[in-house]
Amino acid sequence: ATGCMTYDFFFPGLLLDAFEHQSFEYLLFWINEILTQKLKVVNMLGCHDGIPLLDLKGLLPEERIMEMVEILKKRGGLVKDLHGVQSMYYQVNCTYFSALGESDRKMLLARALQIFMPGKPQVWYLDLFAGKNDIDAVKKANSNGHKEINRTNLTTDQAISSLQTDIVQDQLALLRFRNTCPAFSWDSNIQVQSTASHQLTLTWSYQSHSA
């Protein structure tokens, strides 16, 4: 429907590709597409359904997609094939933190890029807590329980303990900044600069405010 926001299912995979290849080439193309087409999107890193890959066809070369599938499998991700056909990948069930090699630095950078991406950021709770792949939950589930890898039920004690970690506090600081800085407005002007494939600058401006 006209005027409705849509989920940006491209961003998670394009960002992972950018990190692996140290190049923002394909992500930059998509950012410019969002801006020129005036798309209204909700962006995310991980979600309850894993990391979508089928959506990347046409944006990423097939070999880059398959390379990413293999990388995430080595990091504990479980591949969901379309209609059960192994050659027809659909999504990788994996926490975003594990997809990033469980690197605090990459997780924080991913969150920073997310809040500066065009659109409205949505946060999956397990990403915020830097959750790792929950293999035990998958084993306890039925044959279709692959999604449980990214749906850990945190206890109150686990949540409180995680809140004390730097990676969680740093993400919360970024989210507070996104929610309170006047530069991030629905009517903001977003400028994109990239002087080299490994460099990307996103600037939001609204009235006298910029970020």
Residue ranges and their predicted role:
Residues 1-211:
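Active-site and adjacent substrate-binding regions of carbohydrate-active enzymes
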